[in-house]
Swiss-Prot record:
The gene is rpmF. SUPFAM superfamilies: Zn-binding ribosomal proteins (SSF57829). This is Large ribosomal subunit protein bL32. GO terms for molecular function: structural constituent of ribosome. Residues 1-61 are annotated as: Disordered. It comes from Nitrobacter winogradskyi (strain ATCC 25391 / DSM 10237 / CIP 104748 / NCIMB 11846 / Nb-255).
């Protein structure tokens, strides 16, 4: 069984764990409707993505 030669230092342990942090999602303001949406995601209310109609817009009913 493999055994580490040296004890992992606190600095190296912290650098390894730095990638585990969870960041809050970013939002971008939609140019047409002015509502917030995720970047690189389509707007589900209007069905638009990059200025093109991709899906049918949700109806209010």
């Amino acid at each position: 069984m493999a055994v580490p030669r040296r004890k992992t230092s606190p600095s190296r342990r912290g650098m390894r764990r730095s990638a585990d942090a969870i960041s809050k999602p970013t939002y971008a303001e939609d140019k047409d409707s002015g509502e917030l949406r995720r970047p690189h995601h389509l707007d589900l209310k209007t069905g638009m993505y990059k200025g093109r109609q991709v899906l049918k817009a949700k109806s209010d009913s």
